[in-house]
Swiss-Prot record:
Entry keyword annotation includes Methyltransferase: yes
UniProt name for this protein: Ribosomal RNA large subunit methyltransferase H
Recorded GO CC terms: cytoplasm
Gene name linked to the record: rlmH
Main localization, broad class: cytoplasm
Length: 161
């Protein structure tokens, strides 16, 4: 299985970078996982809704260019309006994708303002991490941990409780 996290902006905090690297290492026996980062767009102070929409559009264009243009990836966008999966449901989702030959996944994480409608339209699946709001830079770490947990669940290995 090949999994890509396609995200806007780099993780800047060292403790989060360390966590991301740890889970990338833990995932190596289960899947090829990579993180593709596109630059974030500066948000002007006191940005108007139109300026915010323009920021999301520019970031969205970058995200779409980073996705597999051949349609070989199942695109999963993270959005607060998406489906809430339990860890077991995420494990079942990954297993189902692999079973049906859809083993290339791209999880798309938008910028701090969210995702442009064009990116949302590209989604095969829309996933929510829940109703809480997370620091944007934490999302890759949280997602990687959940993907790791899902692989452990699917293999019946000790980790998930």
């Amino acid at each position: 299985m090949r999994i890509r996290l396609v995200t806007v902006g780099k993780v800047k905090e060292k403790y989060l970078q360390d966590g991301v690297q740890e889970y990338l290492k833990r995932l190596r026996p289960y899947a090829r996982v990579e993180i593709v980062t596109v630059p974030d767009e500066p948000i002007p102070d006191g940005a108007s809704p139109a300026q915010e929409a323009q920021v999301m559009q520019r970031e969205g264009e970058r995200l779409l260019r980073a996705l597999d243009q051949g349609g070989q990836e199942h695109v999963v966008v993270l959005d607060g309006r998406g489906k809430n999966f339990s860890s077991e449901e995420l494990a079942a989702f990954l297993a189902e994708r692999a079973l049906h030959g859809d083993a290339n996944l791209a999880f798309v994480i938008g910028g701090s303002l969210g995702l442009d409608p064009a990116v949302l339209a590209r989604a095969g699946t829309t996933l929510s991490l829940g109703r809480m709001t997370f620091l944007h830079q934490m999302v890759p770490l949280i997602l990687l941990e959940q993907i790791y947990r899902a692989f452990k669940i699917n293999r019946g290995e000790k980790y998930h409780k």
